[in-house]
Amino acid sequence: MSKDILNRYLFDNADVRGQIVQLEKSYQEILSAHTYPEAIARLLGELMAATSLLTATLKFDGDISVQVQGNGPVSLAVINGNNLQQLRGVARWEGEVAKDASLQQLMGQGHMVITLTPNNGERYQGVVALEKETLAECLEQYFLQSEQLPTAIRLFANGKQAAGMLLQVLPGEDEHNEEFEHLEQLTSTIKAEELFELEATEVLHRLYHQEEVRLFDPIEVTFSCTCSRERSGQALKTVAKEELDAILAEQGKIEMGCEYCNSSYSFDSIDIEALFKNAPKADTQQ
């Protein structure tokens, strides 16, 4: 089956919309940059599926960041993306992590931060505590807090594939929607293996074969890193040239690495001189 696809669907006889995302290649590309423990690889997969679903649900043109932060072994896990379903992500951790570690065991006390940066308009940030047992439940809580919309989310990842489903009452409709409750019960029966192995059309038929479902054109999800030599150079220009010269004197070059994709950009003394030519001097005062 085709992987790395987001499908949106709508129920003709209910004020409810849904999405299903299935990921493989893009998920593997995110994991390839680091050797992640199994539990963290699963967390990144769930976070990636969640970000794809959120991007399509919130309907905006611009960038999105979904991150979880905590005081546990994992201090940060983040997926960045945009409305074109181009995603990248990384996690930071210390120490040993059990294979079957739960969200709380990974993150400790923490919170989820969802940041939207539209191409046109004001930046928005929503925060929800990581007080639920699963990432999916935390996201459901986010929608209740920020959108006041009943939402059901299912997220799965196994280190090879990631997938998710989102079901939501349409904005402006009755929050106490019996049709939504019925469809939520049907959706809750989905198994990880079904989302990993079946086409979206088969999944929807298994879940909702007695409902009238309208499936929209699929949207491709890809791994895409926004790092570049130019951006690395711009970052170096925020450092005092004297500090860079000291590094060059000791090491002969400056390496700028991207933690998202493991790309590395090398700058020698000629490169640094060119960066600072005609540039204003950095303010080194604190």
Swiss-Prot record:
Gene Ontology biological process terms from the UniProt entry: protein refolding
Disulfide bonds: C225-C227, C258-C261
InterPro entries: Heat_shock_Hsp33, Heat_shock_Hsp33_C, Heat_shock_Hsp33_N, Hsp33_helix_hairpin_bin_dom_sf
Subcellular location: Cytoplasm
Cellular component terms per the entry's GO annotation: cytoplasm
Post-translational modification: Under oxidizing conditions two disulfide bonds are formed involving the reactive cysteines. Under reducing conditions zinc is bound to the reactive cysteines and the protein is inactive.
Entry superkingdom: Bacteria
Cytoplasm among keywords: yes
Keyword annotations of the record: Chaperone, Cytoplasm, Disulfide bond, Redox-active center, Zinc
Pfam families, A to Z: HSP33
CDD domains for this protein: Hsp33 (cd00498)
Predominant subcellular localization, coarse grouping: cytoplasm
GO molecular function, one term: protein folding chaperone
HAMAP family linked to this entry: HslO
Function statement: Redox regulated molecular chaperone. Protects both thermally unfolding and oxidatively damaged proteins from irreversible aggregation. Plays an important role in the bacterial defense system toward oxidative stress.
Family recorded in the similarity comment: Belongs to the HSP33 family.
Name of protein: 33 kDa chaperonin
